[in-house]
Structure formats: C-alpha cells, structure tokens
Amino acid sequence: MDRTGIFAGDDPFAIAAGWLAEAEPQEPNDPNAIALATVDAAGLPNVRMVLLKEIEAEAFVFYTNYGSQKAVEIETSGKAAFVLHWKSLRRQIRVRGLVEREEGVQADAYYASRSLKSRLGAWASEQSRPLASRTSLLAEVARVTARFGTNPPRPAFWGGFRIRPLEIEFWADGAFRLHDRFRWRRNSLSDGWSIERLNP
C-alpha cells in the first residue's frame, strides 16, 4: 500500500496529532474545532462544533456540560463521531467510536486551566436548556461570582468525554478531485487496526 508522506506511520493518533500541529500556525482560528455528531433517542442526528482539547495515545478528548443535549445523547448511545477539517491544509480526519466520561484529575486540570470567566460561565449556564433572556444569564454569572469569587471548583455536572475510535479516516485533497483517503478500522478497542485505501 502506497501510504507515504503525510499518511505514513503505524499510529493513527500520532498522525492525527501531527496534522493538528501542522494546522495550528496556518488555520485562521480554532484549528482544533471538530464537528461532533450524536443521535437522539429517535435516531435523529445532531451536529455541532466543539473544541478538541487532547489527543491521547488511544483517544480524543473534549469537555462539556453533562446536562447538555450532546452529553445526554452520548450517554444514551455510548457512541459519537466527528470530523476535523482544515481549509488551510485541505485535509480532514473523520472519527467514529465509543465514548466514556473523563471526570477525574484530568478534567480538574483542564477546568483549572480555563479563564476565570469561562470557569464561572460553566457554573452559570444550564447548557441546552431554554433561557429567558441574556440578562438572566448575566445575573446568574453575577450570582456564581459572588458565591465562588476567584476560585470556582469544577462543577460535578461539567467534565470531559473521551472518544475511543473504532474507525479513523485520513483525507487529503487531490487534483481533479482524485483525493487520497486511508481508513483505519478495528472491530473492538482491543483489536489491532486494519488499514485500506479508499476511492475518492
């Protein structure tokens, strides 16, 4: 298989991390933005942009409110998919897999690294629920600010999700739409990867 250059390597997570590092100085903003897809109880899909915060040895990690629609749908199905696309590189990565919570010291550390206003905002926002007005949201921010001051703890309802892929596809633009695509697949998390080139 002619998997060379930007596609070379035996570790898909290392390839993904390398592509992200290459995109960071070139992409206009949020090179780590992913379009995260979930499905509701009726099987109707939802998709939204979130920020990918970590690429681990065997997983991709993002953070959110556990009461949000995305979190509820993830915990109902145990699955999610996302695409990471860079116009500057003309490349993308597609991921499908199983999801688990990250709510330990790793989530604490990421929460602590956020700006104070973002940490307070996590307390103030009942994400995805109806909101009477922006004024009421700002009033809640003021209330939690008075309660916690400059050291709000991580809320129990806020933390990470770790996506453990069963499938990762690397795509790069080619002339005349003759794109290069390589798909890594495994049947379970304990299996090794099989790799195949796909038609554009």
UniProtKB/Swiss-Prot annotation:
Name the record gives this protein: Pyridoxine/pyridoxamine 5'-phosphate oxidase
Binding-site positions, FMN: 48-53, 63-64, 70, 92, 127-128, 171, 181
Cofactor remark from the record: Binds 1 FMN per subunit.
Keywords (A to Z) from UniProt: Flavoprotein, FMN, Oxidoreductase, Pyridoxine biosynthesis
GO biological processes: pyridoxine biosynthetic process
NCBIfam families: pdxH, PRK05679.1
Function description: Catalyzes the oxidation of either pyridoxine 5'-phosphate (PNP) or pyridoxamine 5'-phosphate (PMP) into pyridoxal 5'-phosphate (PLP).
Pathway the protein acts in: Cofactor metabolism; pyridoxal 5'-phosphate salvage; pyridoxal 5'-phosphate from pyridoxamine 5'-phosphate: step 1/1; Cofactor metabolism; pyridoxal 5'-phosphate salvage; pyridoxal 5'-phosphate from pyridoxine 5'-phosphate: step 1/1
Subunit structure, as described in the record: Homodimer.
GO molecular function: FMN binding; pyridoxamine phosphate oxidase activity
Catalytic activity as recorded in UniProt: pyridoxamine 5'-phosphate + O2 + H2O = pyridoxal 5'-phosphate + H2O2 + NH4(+); pyridoxine 5'-phosphate + O2 = pyridoxal 5'-phosphate + H2O2
Protein species of origin: Cereibacter sphaeroides (strain ATCC 17029 / ATH 2.4.9) (Rhodobacter sphaeroides)
Required co-factors: FMN
Entry EC no(s): 1.4.3.5
Protein family per UniProt: Belongs to the pyridoxamine 5'-phosphate oxidase family.
Binding site for substrate: 53, 110, 114, 118, 177-179
